[in-house]
Amino acid sequence: MINFHPDNALLAAYAADTLPLSMTLAVAIHVEFCPTCARRVADLERQLAESVLIADKIFPEEEHLFDDMLSYILEQPSVTVPVQMEEPKIEIQGQSFWLPRALRHISRQNWQQMGNIGRSRLLLDDQSSGRASLMYLSAGAAVPQHTHRGMELTLPLTGVFRDELGEYIPGDFVLRDAKVAHQPQSRDGCLCFALLDAPVQFTQGLPRLLNGFGDLLY
């Protein structure tokens, strides 16, 4: 069962379409996994739609104009446009993984590999809320212990990872900040959506040796 969710403010901003793109993707992925938050977003969207209808209520003398316009639109012949769907799977280390709908049309960089951890940066025009990537932890992989100079969001897509604070399954919306030092690891392998708004800060090992690893994560 999913135990980690966006807060109500994030869900409301998502329903109102006011989030930066990278955070919109994160919430959309979670909502695809989480029926509870999907229902909450549907309720929020319905409330927003009702408020817009009330604000834009048509005056009685203009109602026939709206009806005429609607009738004209409905009478137009429908046109079927073929849509080229991208392959909803990705491959890494000889394994195939299905992607959530929100990520299937997002361009990505080639995979970069450092040891048993890989990263593919998402190519987003809007990076105002940070850099978004796909991260893959191979079976037995562990990220060196670190804290954060900003916000770190990790959302498992396939597989499970854990740290000192718990275990996280596909759909969990895991937010961490500078108050948290942790060492994510996966026993059987885990593909994640990751969002960082600043580089991580390693708390163990030699910083110089880990600089390249930090660049890979960010």
Would you name each region that the model predicts?
Residues 1-7, 21-23, 33-35, 46-107:
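Positively biased amphipathic helices and basic secretion/translocation or surface-docking motifs
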Residues 12-22:
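Short Cys/His-rich Zn2+-coordinating modules
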Residues 30:
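Short metal-coordination and nucleic-acid-contact micro-motifs, chiefly zinc-binding Cys/His arrays
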Residues 41, 143-146, 164, 181-187:
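Short beta-strand His + acidic residue motifs that chelate non-heme Fe in jelly-roll/DSBH
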Residues 116-148, 178-181:
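Conserved short histidine dyad/triad with adjacent acidic residue
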Residues 138-141, 147-163:
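Glycine- and acidic-residue-biased ligand/ion/polar-headgroup-sensing regions
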Residues 163-183:
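Short acidic-glycine-tyrosine-enriched beta hairpin
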Residues 180-202:
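Ligand-binding loop in jelly-roll beta-barrel domains
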